[in-house]
Amino acid sequence: MKGMIMLISCLMLIDVVVESKNGYIIEPKGCKYSCFWGSSTWCNRECKFKKGSSGYCAWPACWCYGLPDNVKIFDYYNNKCGK
């Protein structure tokens, strides 16, 4: 029983440590990184530069997977692009 509790505790800790987010990466002014069909290689490179696991061009902007919590992503409700 103690072993089972320890296993569950470890799994919960791993989930907290490896938690990541997905979303559109943004430029310093708050706008999404623009892309065109066929530029998924560029988006993937940009996402990995920001410590994400991968990314692709979800036209018209780069979508990233596995971003760390400190990386800002586009938020529709707090959009600062062009303001």
From Swiss-Prot:
Localization per record: Secreted
Pfam family for this entry, one: Toxin_3
Disulphide connectivity of cysteines: C31-C81, C35-C57, C43-C62, C47-C64
Highest taxon of source: Eukaryota
GO biological process, one term: defense response to bacterium
GO molecular function, a single term: sodium channel inhibitor activity
LCN-type CS-alpha/beta domain: residues covered: 21-82
Annotated signal sequence range: 1-20
InterPro entries (UniProt xref): LCN-type_CS_alpha_beta_dom (IPR044062), Scorpion_toxin-like (IPR003614), Scorpion_toxin-like_sf (IPR036574), Scorpion_toxinL (IPR018218), Scorpion_toxinL/defensin (IPR002061)
Keywords assigned: Amidation, Antibiotic, Antimicrobial, Disulfide bond, Ion channel impairing toxin, Neurotoxin, Secreted, Signal, Toxin, Voltage-gated sodium channel impairing toxin
Modified residues (Cysteine amide): C81
Tissue expression profile of the protein: Expressed by the venom gland.
Main location: secreted
Cellular component annotations (GO), alphabetically ordered: extracellular region
Role summary: Inhibits the sodium (Nav) currents in an apparent irreversible manner. Produces small depolarization and induces repetitive firing in squid axons. Is specific for arthropods (crickets, triatomides, crabs and squids), but is non-toxic to mice. Shows antibacterial activity against both Gram-positive and Gram-negative bacteria.
Annotated family: Belongs to the long (4 C-C) scorpion toxin superfamily. Sodium channel inhibitor family. Beta subfamily.
Notes concerning its domains: Has the structural arrangement of an alpha-helix connected to antiparallel beta-sheets by disulfide bonds (CS-alpha/beta).
Protein's recorded name: Ardiscretin
Organism of provenance: Tityus discrepans
